[in-house]
Design a protein with these regions (language model features):
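Subset of outer-membrane beta-barrel
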Residues: 1-233
């Protein structure tokens, strides 16, 4: 695998109506070859000057969830700290909040999640000495990247239904609408909001063995001749 994904979590109830939890996520690519020092001062290629570095995103999340007094309703809140590291070249710290609401009735589950509701900010610290080692590309001098990265709020609406069959078989069907408040190349896109539908299935046997499949990432891809082509994954 090119990328590594690691996850750990802990949760426990506070009382019969609420619970809290913490989680740690790492998503990174390790052992990337750094060839910025490949050529020595005399213009000779020296492979011993190649080093390796990792780029990784870390997410620490504190979560709280509670059932509401209205039957079937429950909500949750995430407070998250984000750490991003690109070798010795740059690193950043960020923070943000997510909120979610769920409703269950007659075996149907409905959900609304607002991600990065306050806008998530990542403030970068860039190693200018390492950046200056990068060569010019096509005679163009590279500008130092901006030090603040902004993640705008997103919304996600979902619905699911569990179907149980004879002999311990079950099927969970779910559909999501993932919304970004900007224009993208999603199949449904306006100047105000872009919507990416997703459909998923989960087959289970005795709630022990699970098999998942799904469709998503519906987009209008721009081809080499500037025409658009519909695609999905």
């Amino acid at each position: 695998n090119i990328a590594n994904y690691d996850y750990g979590a802990y949760a426990e109830p506070i009382d019969p109506e609420s619970a809290w939890g913490v989680s740690l996520i790492r998503f990174g690519v390790d052992d990337i070859l750094n060839t910025s020092d490949l050529i020595d001062e005399d213009g000779n290629i020296d492979y011993s000057r190649i080093s390796k570095f990792s780029t990784a995103d870390y997410g620490f999340t504190f979560s709280y969830a509670r059932k509401l007094k209205v039957p079937g309703f429950q909500y949750g809140v995430n407070a998250k700290i984000i750490r991003r590291v690109i070798g010795d070249f740059a690193n950043s710290w960020g923070f943000g909040f997510d909120v979610g609401l769920q409703f269950e009735r007659n075996g149907w589950n409905y959900g609304l999640m607002l991600r990065d509701i306050t806008t998530t900010y990542n403030v970068w610290n860039i190693n200018e000495d390492e950046f200056d080692k990068l060569p010019e590309i096509g005679g163009i001098v590279q500008d130092l990247p901006q030090s603040t990265e902004i993640t705008l709020p997103k919304a996600q609406i979902g619905i699911s239904k569990q179907f149980d069959f004879h002999y311990d078989y079950g099927l969970l069907v779910a559909m999501n609408l993932n919304m970004e408040f900007t224009k993208t190349n999603d199949y449904i896109a306006t100047d105000f909001v872009s919507v990416a539908p997703a459909l998923g299935f989960q087959f289970d046997y005795t709630k022990v063995v699970f098999l998942r499949a799904g469709f998503g990432n519906f987009q209008n891809e721009v081809q080499l001749d500037n025409s658009e082509s519909f695609s999905f994954q």
